[in-house]
A protein has these predicted regions:
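Polytopic transmembrane helical bundles with strong interfacial aromatic enrichment
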Residues: 1-231
């Protein structure tokens, strides 16, 4: 197992994360207003970008967990730890942002039901909540139940498979998009799409640096000796 990052490397990495986060903030604030929503469109766009980033992190987590199940080496498992530590909490943040964005931007005029009841009918919000429950279960198993790394990695892989099935079903079936417009960002002009893709790139880079830092500090301390049963 490699040594933990030096103080200078940590400071440089944290500085890079701060710079990337600031870049994301500036990009979000400079998004143009749109007819109807005005400046309220900024939160949904950032939520969409952050969700894209989290889906990519889940994909990397699943791939890394699968590689570890084959190789059973410390270095790969350190990346499993780092990606898990970043991707799982980010989904919780994204779930909260998604709910706030829905309540702030959807038009409930003329509905006889409360906004909460209407929002609950959106398959995308429902999927977010189901996967949020899955995140909680994965973290609880990781912290309180599983002791062997192989069991932790198998749980990660099972969660990623569940997320892939649920999200693919929603994205591929137009009938399940419910209240959510069909690709509102991708159907916009480049004054929206350009900043959106820049936000995705910067936010993804920020999360990867965070995963790398966790890998460096937490990974070496999590069962550094490969158990004989895992060989």
């Amino acid at each position: 197992m490699s040594e933990k990052p030096s103080r200078n490397v940590v400071l440089a990495s944290v500085g890079a994360m701060v710079a990337l986060a600031v870049a994301v903030f500036v990009l979000v604030m400079r998004l143009p207003e749109v007819v109807g929503l005005g400046s309220r469109v900024k939160l949904p766009i950032f939520h969409g970008a952050s969700t894209w980033v989290d889906i990519m992190l889940f994909l990397l987590l699943g791939i890394t967990a699968a590689i570890f199940l084959v190789r059973r080496d410390d270095a790969t498992y350190a990346w499993v730890v780092g990606l898990r530590a970043v991707a799982m909490p980010l989904w919780a943040v994204n779930s909260v942002m998604g709910f706030i964005a829905a309540m702030n931007t959807w038009d409930f005029t003329g509905s006889s039901q409360s906004p909460l009841v209407v929002a609950r009918q959106d398959p995308r919000l429902t999927a977010q909540l189901v996967l949020l429950l899955g995140v909680a279960i994965v973290l609880l198993l990781d912290w309180l139940v599983h002791e062997k790394r192989i069991h932790k990695a198998m749980t990660d892989l099972a969660f990623v498979a569940l997320a892939a099935v649920m999200l693919s079903d929603i994205f591929l079936d137009p009938a399940k998009r419910a209240l959510h417009p069909d690709s509102p960002v991708l159907n916009s002009g480049w004054d929206i799409k350009g900043p959106f893709f820049a936000i995705v790139a910067a936010w993804f880079a920020c999360m990867l640096v965070g995963a790398w830092l966790v890998r460096g500090f937490v990974g070496p301390d999590v069962e550094p000796e490969t158990l004989p049963a895992e060989k």
